[in-house]
Amino acid sequence: MERRNPSERGVPAGFSGHASVESGGETQESPATVVFRPPGNNTDGGATAGGSQAAAAAGAEPMEPESRPGPSGMNVVQVAELFPELRRILTINEDGQGLKGVKRERGASEATEEARNLTFSLMTRHRPECVTFQQIKDNCANELDLLAQKYSIEQLTTYWLQPGDDFEEAIRVYAKVALRPDCKYKISKLVNIRNCCYISGNGAEVEIDTEDRVAFRCSMINMWPGVLGMDGVVIMNVRFTGPNFSGTVFLANTNLILHGVSFYGFNNTCVEAWTDVRVRGCAFYCCWKGVVCRPKSRASIKKCLFERCTLGILSEGNSRVRHNVASDCGCFMLVKSVAVIKHNMVCGNCEDRASQMLTCSDGNCHLLKTIHVASHSRKAWPVFEHNILTRCSLHLGNRRGVFLPYQCNLSHTKILLEPESMSKVNLNGVFDMTMKIWKVLRYDETRTRCRPCECGGKHIRNQPVMLDVTEELRPDHLVLACTRAEFGSSDEDTD
């Protein structure tokens, strides 16, 4: 992975020079000029166009297009000369009475050329890069120098990764790595990340095709020089696909930041975190598990999109889930520990059927709901505020304290209460017109089904016997008016 001297300005390898980029190195014939012909003036327009072509053939200077401002001008206007970008999309009708727009399909060659132009622009852009990661390591003679942050991420030299390069070696040597948008990368073996790094994908696609159980293992075991803005492992703007991969994409034992990363069609876990993890602006499409937060982990998941995932978020540690959107997910979030759930919008399945996956987190087997709060004898209820649920189901297990959702819209939502949790739910601060509340009375042992569980195994589930308790828990709006403080506005949050 030899890299040219970053101080030398010029065209990167694999690209043409400026002359060939601008003019192609060849003289191309310009396409035929498109001429506006107003109705009733075809003779003059044809004569003018013919005169221009004849003058061009004779070697004389072409005449300037005559035009008059305003929509009523009857002179000929050569639009292609005024706007060259319209040459390919404007044609003249057969009768010559007007113009017709032609919609051109975007071919693969045009998309490739656009990606190459974007890559050329990114690689030739001037940046204040003055030092390499190896030079920073050489300057650190002792542990005190390792702790001092003398440089920032902007000053670190970027290495542009080629499709044939080794991911692990490039991250170890250069730390700041960028991917080319016009290339497709392939991961064929496990990538161990043992130092802080900053990977900018620029929208490039990375296909994972390996038989290993993990694609990226983030485990920093050594001390590395500190760089301001490069805290842990940072990965941004990368599209991951893995149609033939059945393992975990990211297994993080160190600080991990995923910014604007997309995951497409993974039949296993996308992100499994055992420590601090921040997932921001990511998208999960048709994945089995999106983000799994193991015990003692701290996760921040915000502004993400979950679409058609079996299990979006599994929280076994301390999680903060804010400003996310979920659509057609079997279970958006399974809460086994404490969590903060705010400002999320969740739409349930379009089909009128429940999820067939179980959870055995509290020792009992229950069907996973769209938002599932598992029972825990020592944990408090999650903070549940400013969420919008549509065609969803909410499972509430037994916990300490009172579950008090604040300003949540439960539209066409079913709430399932376990036997001990009915007296611990207060729904005075929700929009409750179309919600339904059911309480589990007992479990019928004569009606059992064997279902797959989120733990990876299969369990037998007893069918619950439920009772409709909607009116028992719905507040009396003739006594508790909607103008009270639960739905009011403060100085910080005005209507």
Curated annotation (Swiss-Prot):
The modification Phosphoserine is found at S489, S490. GO terms for cellular component: host cell cytoplasm; host cell nucleus. It comes from the Viruses. One of its GO terms (biological process) is symbiont-mediated suppression of host PKR/eIFalpha signaling. Residues 40-60 have a biased composition (Low complexity). Residues 1-74 are annotated as: Disordered. The keyword Hydrolase does not apply. It is found in: Host nucleus; Host cytoplasm. Gene3D superfamilies: Single-stranded right-handed beta-helix, Pectin lyase-like (2.160.20.10). InterPro entries: Adeno_E1B_55K_N, Adeno_E1B_55kDa, Pectin_lyas_fold, Pectin_lyase_fold/virulence. GO terms for molecular function: protein serine/threonine kinase inhibitor activity; ubiquitin-like ligase-substrate adaptor activity. Keywords: Early protein, Host cytoplasm, Host nucleus, Host-virus interaction, Inhibition of host innate immune response by virus, Inhibition of host interferon signaling pathway by virus, Inhibition of host PKR by virus, Interferon antiviral system evasion, Modulation of host cell apoptosis by virus, Phosphoprotein, Viral immunoevasion. Pfam families: Adeno_E1B_55K, Adeno_E1B_55K_N. The modification Phosphothreonine is found at T494. The keyword Glycosyltransferase does not apply. Interacts with host PML-4 and PML-5; this interaction promotes efficient subnuclear targeting of E1B-55K to PML nuclear bodies. Interacts with E4-ORF3 protein. Interacts with E4-ORF6 protein. Plays a major role to prevent cellular inhibition of viral genome replication. Assembles an SCF-like E3 ubiquitin ligase complex based on the cellular proteins ELOB, ELOC, CUL5 and RBX1, in cooperation with viral E4orf6. This viral RING-type ligase ubiquitinates cellular substrates and targets them to proteasomal degradation: TP53/p53, LIG4, MRE11-RAD50-NBS1 (MRN) complex, ITGA3, DAXX and BLM. E1B-55K probably acts as the substrate-specific adapter of the SCF-like E3 ubiquitin ligase complex. Belongs to the adenoviridae E1B 55 kDa protein family. Contains a PML interaction motif that allows the subnuclear PML localization. This is E1B 55 kDa protein. It comes from Human adenovirus C serotype 2 (HAdV-2). The gene is E1B.
